[in-house]
Amino acid sequence: MEKTNNNIPSAEELAIYIKEATVSVNTKYEQSPVVLMVDDSIIGTLGNFSASIGKAKSKKTFNVSAIAASALANSTVLHYRSSFPENKRTILYIDTEQGEPHCQKVLQRILCLAGLPKNADSDNLIMLGLRKYSPEMIFDLEQDALCI
């Protein structure tokens, strides 16, 4: 049973969700395909999404730029190695802290690291600069963008 609306689930529905979500040591689970590695360590599998959090000025943006460039090029960039299926190559990059000029610089950096021209948008990279919106609007925009 997949929850598809924002209604508060009943106690019965919650019990079903808990049963579906229970992980057992006795069950064999299918491993998702590995699509992103740093050197020999797995950091991403198909079907997952990630957020980068950390202290201010801790190089989060540069790190995520390198990961995004690797995914965009579907190759190795600064020790990050990507191997995405052809039909799973769209990258959604959401920045909620930086203004549009800074986001544009990050976008150009990603394109450059991926070996692409930094003066042409890529069909496989969607960058959203959401700083100007309220937290509630950001949440709604993120939810909608994930359906792209």
Task: State where each predicted segment sits.
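TOPRIM fold recognition
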Residues: 1-4, 146
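The Walker A/P-loop phosphate-binding site
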Residues: 6-110
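Conserved inter-motif catalytic segment of the P-loop NTP-binding fold
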Residues: 85-148
